[in-house]
Amino acid sequence: CIPASIDRLEEMNELGCCAFKVFISYANPDYPHLPDHELCRAMEKVSKFGGMIAVHAENADIVSNFCQWKKEEGIRQPSRYHEGRPAFSEVEAIQRAVLFSKVYGTDLLICHMSAAEGVDATLEARRQGHHVYTETCPHYLAYYNTRMDECGAFAKCNPPIRPRDNLERLWDHVLN
């Protein structure tokens, strides 16, 4: 779902679409990030027909500025890529998406969660009876940031692969 398609959500639902992915961080020019007011608008529309919003959760402002700062500092090592996309930017975006989903009663999926702390916001919302779901990816459970120096660009993804302690906490959430 991009800003230009928000007015067509009902039409897309009638054609069989029941879930819509949004980027609340920068993705690329073809899939611009959805500003908060547009995310709220999309959630309001989707909640009316019982659909789901799936969110790529990273704070666009933090990520774009931190990435720029890291480049200016000369940080180029793959193992330090996560510093330009800090875990707190993912956690904040998750908390914001959860808040909006509570306001509008929209089912929410947090896509490819990499920050273990982000799970807490979703668990609390579920305890309160909200339909908030999460998924992670195998690479977040198998690799930690220092392995990126071996793998190089093959391991570059967003949200990024994080330090080892995060991997261990993410596994704790998966197993419990």
Each model region followed by its residue ranges:
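Histidine/acidic residue-rich metal-binding segments in metalloenzymes
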Residues: 4-176
